[in-house]
């Protein structure tokens, strides 16, 4: 198939990062160019990101936890009027507080669905209920779990999909965003062995390089990696 020539030359992506436990906020502009001198289109894409929630879903001013209800409202206000948006999480989400553990993460999954999360990767604590339950929680949350470096014994991906691709159209021009996720292989040693029995946690850096190249080859203009790692220097 003949690859279509890009019609736009500038993309602006605003990244809002929420530290749901600490209540930290930030906005980061990111630009990409195709080298053309005309036909510029600016896409206003807003991304809401959380990580290490550890089932702290209730607002707690004393411990500086904003809670899922407040997060949902802030995210809705922030993304209103944008050309497109994504809500992403980097794991350690479904486990850590009685409100979650008593129902094996279902309460958190339902709140994630209500907030409108699009995708997440996994942290070691997300495997605490076992691998099958983690898949179930992804379904309850209606969120794509992206940890493509985690494989079954036959080499196929454990989760249903390795990537999320979102297309945003404006003024007849399309921006294609690809999202993938990686989880630290060391996670296999950070949970009960039976929770991850039969799974192969492959090298995160090697997988990330391959998947980023794949998404670019598929025409993605922006590639986002979600990672949960104990070694940020080698994954960043």
Language model features: what each stretch is:
Residues 1-7:
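N-terminal secretory signal peptides that target proteins for export/translocation
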Residues 8-30:
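Sec-dependent N-terminal signal peptides of Gram-positive bacterial secreted proteins and lipoproteins
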Residues 33-236:
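Acidic, metal/ion-coordinating pockets
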């Amino acid at each position: 198939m003949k690859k279509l020539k890009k019609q736009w030359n500038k993309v602006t992506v605003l990244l809002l990062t929420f530290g749901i436990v600490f209540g930290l906020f930030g906005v980061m502009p990111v630009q990409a160019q195709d080298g053309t001198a005309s036909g510029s289109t600016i896409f206003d894409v807003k991304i809401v990101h959380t990580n290490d929630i550890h089932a702290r879903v209730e607002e707690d001013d004393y411990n500086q936890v904003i809670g899922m209800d407040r997060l949902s409202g802030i995210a809705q206000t922030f993304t209103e009027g944008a050309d497109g948006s994504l809500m992403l999480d980097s794991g350690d989400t479904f486990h850590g507080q009685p409100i979650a553990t008593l129902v094996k993460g279902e309460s958190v999954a339902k709140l994630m669905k209500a907030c409108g999360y699009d995708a997440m990767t996994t942290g070691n604590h997300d495997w605490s209920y076992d691998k099958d339950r983690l898949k179930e929680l992804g379904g309850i949350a209606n969120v794509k779990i992206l940890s493509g470096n985690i494989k079954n014994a036959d080499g196929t991906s454990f989760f249903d999909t390795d990537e999320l691709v979102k297309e945003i159209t404006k003024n007849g021009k399309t921006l294609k965003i690809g999202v993938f996720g990686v989880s630290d292989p060391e996670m296999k040693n950070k949970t009960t062995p039976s929770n991850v029995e039969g799974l192969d946690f492959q090298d995160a850096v090697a997988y990330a390089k391959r998947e980023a190249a794949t998404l670019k080859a598929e025409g993605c203009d922006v590639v986002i990696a979600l990672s949960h790692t104990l070694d940020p220097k080698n994954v960043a």
